[in-house]
């Protein structure tokens, strides 16, 4: 330890004032630490005791432990300390020679001094906890430069510690300014998303809809930037529908199913099913009451809110149709939840049924709107297309003709609104019978029977005879098979357009399209042991290769079954 007797040291040493022996004798100096003082600094004690016979220099005083003093430290002291006296640390007059050298290097680790570490606040708290005052014979004084360095280091610690709590923009990974539109985002992405949804901007990617969006390239492609905003969970209402982008698409659809359309506070989530306490049981409703509930559940009309300027192009038409479809899907979830008994099914079953029939429901609604407009398809009150206008989309002419033919059949049958709402509900409930449990299957069958009875009741209100009523029921049910066939063609076409990057697909529409393919790919395959026996009796697939048949699903396959390709 260096002897601090030189006046040329950088840090001045503050000496203690001399105290009259009459005031020190038998008493203990116990000054209270001032709240303005911070952590203690080493100070120096001069040796005014001339009666010992030693010429002691001014030495730095750190802790009694440096001098091998075995007394308790300040933090461990529960009683009053003795007054500081040099006789505690140095021998009496008999000692000859130079002052005792102090070797601080003998310790393996630097000894932590309680005079340096204990802050004034800690000292006061310790005094209150132990119930005894902690006497200090010296009052530590901090130099201004040391105080300034300590403050800077504390601020640096706070700053470095605060960085661990920073959030990053979910879109471009820049520093987030806050929680905007349901996710953590920066000011730039927040403002971009706000402009896009307020002005209803429609962007087209000049490349392949796979542009990289980061801090440096977020302004390079508006279409991909808006697509990523939707992918990470930005919503127009500003409420977070899903937590991050790490959930599967099915989990995000389940979140929508449980959140959208829930305005009744009595609707609660119990287990895996959503139970509405105020919703009557389907068996408790008469056919007339059930039809009335189905008519009340009908979604509102969706407007494109955009003037389609001619000549129409493939990009304009597909952009408008996919935009309308995405909006209708949101209302479809609300419509399904309003069907009596649907929310009693398991949540996974609700999602699965919607995923299997969403395009059929959209198409039967399209036919209903187009009944009074021969030769045209009314996609919305402000968007209707003739066959010539729809032919600008590659591969859409065949689907357009099938839709016009099915609409013509609906017109011939003079479909009533009561019959229409029953058929629409039957499409949803009959889309798939493979549910998660036998209990859910039983509930679904009872609900389907109730809707079928309501359809029979609606037909019975006409002036037709019993034989004509049965014939009409058969014609209406056969109409459902035509709608499913057109739906499979439409799904095939939409999937091809997506693979060719012909049109951007956003949010719910893209998820539903992917879910349709995902569910179809989960169909059971035949084992290798069974394939030779089956192939011996069946003709080979037309597109089989030399390595054997490949059983893959195509959107055009009926009932979503896998077929050899």
UniProtKB/Swiss-Prot annotation:
Keyword match Transcription: yes
Gene3D superfamilies, A to Z: Erythroid Transcription Factor GATA-1, subunit A, Retinoid X Receptor
Domain NR LBD: 286-516
CDD domains: NR_DBD_ER, NR_LBD_ER
Compartments (UniProt record): Nucleus
Modulating: annotated span: 1-168
Annotated stretches, region: Hinge: 235-285
Keyword annotations of the record: DNA-binding, Lipid-binding, Metal-binding, Nucleus, Receptor, Steroid-binding, Transcription, Transcription regulation, Zinc, Zinc-finger
Tissue spec. comment: Abundant in the ovary and testes, barely detectable in the brain and muscle and undetectable in the liver.
DNA-binding region in chain numbering: 169-234
GO molecular function annotation: hormone binding; nuclear estrogen receptor activity; sequence-specific DNA binding; steroid binding; zinc ion binding
SUPFAM superfamilies tied to this protein: Glucocorticoid receptor-like (DNA-binding domain), Nuclear receptor ligand-binding domain
Keyword Secreted appears in the UniProt entry: no
One GO process term, biological-process aspect: estrogen receptor signaling pathway
PROSITE patterns in the record: NR_LBD (PS51843), NUCLEAR_REC_DBD_1 (PS00031), NUCLEAR_REC_DBD_2 (PS51030)
Family: Belongs to the nuclear hormone receptor family. NR3 subfamily.
Subunit-structure text: Homodimer.
Name by which UniProt lists this protein: Estrogen receptor gamma
Organism the protein comes from: Micropogonias undulatus
Organism lineage string: Eukaryota, Metazoa, Chordata, Craniata, Vertebrata
Gene designation per UniProt: esr3
């Amino acid at each position: 330890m260096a002897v601090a007797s030189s006046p040329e040291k950088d840090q001045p040493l503050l000496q203690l004032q001399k105290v009259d022996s009459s005031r020190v004798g038998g008493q203990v100096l116990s000054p209270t630490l001032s709240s303005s003082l911070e952590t203690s600094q080493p100070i120096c004690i001069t040796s005014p005791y001339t009666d010992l016979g030693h010429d002691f220099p001014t030495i730095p005083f750190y802790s009694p432990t440096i001098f091998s003093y075995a007394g308790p430290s300040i933090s461990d002291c529960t009683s009053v300390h003795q007054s500081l006296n040099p006789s505690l640390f140095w021998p009496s007059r008999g000692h000859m020679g130079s002052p005792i050298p102090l070797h601080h290097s003998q310790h393996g680790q630097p000894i932590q001094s309680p005079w340096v570490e204990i802050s004034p606040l800690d000292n006061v708290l310790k005094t209150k906890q132990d119930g005894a005052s902690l006497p200090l014979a010296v009052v530590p004084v901090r130099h201004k430069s040391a105080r300034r360095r300590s403050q800077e280091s504390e601020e640096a610690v706070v700053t470095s510690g605060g960085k661990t709590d920073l959030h990053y923009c979910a879109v471009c990974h820049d520093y987030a300014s806050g929680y905007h539109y349901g996710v953590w985002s920066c000011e730039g992405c927040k403002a971009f998303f706000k402009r896009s949804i307020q002005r209803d901007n429609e962007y087209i990617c000049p490349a392949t809809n796979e542009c990289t969006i980061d801090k440096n390239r977020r302004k390079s492609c508006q279409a991909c930037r808006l697509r990523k905003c939707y992918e990470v969970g930005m919503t127009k209402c500003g409420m977070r529908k899903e937590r991050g982008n790490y959930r599967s698409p099915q989990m995000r659809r389940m979140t929508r199913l449980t959140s959208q359309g829930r305005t009744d506070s009595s609707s609660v989530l119990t287990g895996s099913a959503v139970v509405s306490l105020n919703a009557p049981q389907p068996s408790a409703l008469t056919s007339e009451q059930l039809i009335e509930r189905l008519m009340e559940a009908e979604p509102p009309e969706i407007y494109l809110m955009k003037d389609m300027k001619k000549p129409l192009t493939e990009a304009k038409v597909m952009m408008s149709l996919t935009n309308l479809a995405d909006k209708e899907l949101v209302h479809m979830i609300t419509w399904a939840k309003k069907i009596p008994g649907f929310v009693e099914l398991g949540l996974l079953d609700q999602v699965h049924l919607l995923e299997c029939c969403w395009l059929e429901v959209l198409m039967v609604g399209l036919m209903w709107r187009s009944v009074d407009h021969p030769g045209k398809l009314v996609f919305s009150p402000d968007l209707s297309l003739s066959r010539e206008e729809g032919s600008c989309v590659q591969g859409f002419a065949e689907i357009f003709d099938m839709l016009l033919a099915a609409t013509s059949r609906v017109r011939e049958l003079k479909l009533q609104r009561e019959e229409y709402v029953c058929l629409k509900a039957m499409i949803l409930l009959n889309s798939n019978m493979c549910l998660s449990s036998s209990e859910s299957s039983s509930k679904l069958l009872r609900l389907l029977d109730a809707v079928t009875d309501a359809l029979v009741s609606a037909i019975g209100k006409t002036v037709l005879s019993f034989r004509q009523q049965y014939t009409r029921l058969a014609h209406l049910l056969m109409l459902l098979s035509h709608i499913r066939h057109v739906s499979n063609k439409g799904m095939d076409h939409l999937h091809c357009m997506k693979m060719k990057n012909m049109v951007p697909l956003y949010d719910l529409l893209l998820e539903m399209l992917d879910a349709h393919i995902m569910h179809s790919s989960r169909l059971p395959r035949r084992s290798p042991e069974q394939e030779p026996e089956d192939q011996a009796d069946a003709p080979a697939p037309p597109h089989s290769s030399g390595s054997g048949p490949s059983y893959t699903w195509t959107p055009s396959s009926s009932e979503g079954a896998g077929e050899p390709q």
